[in-house]
UniProtKB/Swiss-Prot annotation:
Cell compartments where the protein resides: Cell membrane
Source organism of this protein record: Drosophila persimilis
Activity regulation info: Alternates between an inactive form bound to GDP and an active form bound to GTP. Activated by a guanine nucleotide-exchange factor (GEF) and inactivated by a GTPase-activating protein (GAP).
CC annotations in GO: membrane; plasma membrane
Record-listed E.C. numbers: 3.6.5.2
Key words of the record: Cell membrane, GTP-binding, Hydrolase, Lipoprotein, Membrane, Methylation, Nucleotide-binding, Prenylation
Protein's name according to its UniProt entry: Ras-like protein 1
Recorded topology in the membrane: Lipid-anchor
Length: 189
């Protein structure tokens, strides 16, 4: 069974824990209790493959930012979560993305942009803005509501598909690099 290490990142209060708990336990947590770091595991079937999701729910508060590099090193894929009612949380996404790329020392890292709290009537981040940023980053965009469960499975499952795609691409590049080149015989006189 394949294990996927998923990391949920974003500013404080965007609903990272609520999304994770909704996926794992099928219920909505409506009280806000800032997370330092929580880890969850769940066995699921995605596209016919049974896999184990190892999900790290991270601290959004700035005082825990020193811990970020460590979990970014171990994560295979990242949910970049913002709240649709918070323009600031949307602006912070770029910082998280750049930090992930720096820590992973890679231009392309499996990520999914997640606009959470879509059940709210007031949105300060328009759908088009989020889609445009996701397009610039070359990553999928999923709208979710931890409260109604809308898009929750889709967000996590899409991230697993992005990780698989990334592994396939790296495998193909590796095979191309390992092909023997035409060899010429040399004679030393």
């Amino acid at each position: 069974m394949t294990e996927y290490k998923l990391v949920v990142v974003g500013a404080g209060g965007v609903g990272k824990s609520a999304l994770t708990i909704q996926l794992i336990q099928n219920h909505f947590v409506d009280e806000y209790d800032p997370t330092i770091e929580d880890s969850y595991r769940k066995q699921v079937v995605i596209d016919g493959e049974t896999c184990l999701l190892d999900i790290l729910d991270t601290a959004g508060q700035e005082e825990y930012s020193a811990m970020r590099d460590q979990y970014m090193r171990t994560g295979e894929g990242f949910l970049l979560v913002f709240a649709v009612n918070s323009a600031k949380s949307f602006e912070d996404i770029g910082t998280y993305r750049e930090q992930i790329k720096r820590v992973k020392d890679a231009e392309e890292v499996p990520m999914v942009l997640v606009g959470n709290k879509c059940d709210l009537t007031t949105w300060n981040v328009k759908n088009e803005q989020a889609r445009e940023v996701a397009k610039q980053y070359g990553i999928p965009y999923i709208e979710t509501s931890a409260k109604t469960r809308m898009g929750v499975d889709d967000a996590f499952y899409t991230l697993v598909r992005e990780i698989r795609k990334d592994k396939d691409n790296k495998g193909r590049r590796g095979r191309k690099l390992n092909k023997p080149n035409r060899r010429f015989k040399c004679k030393i006189l």
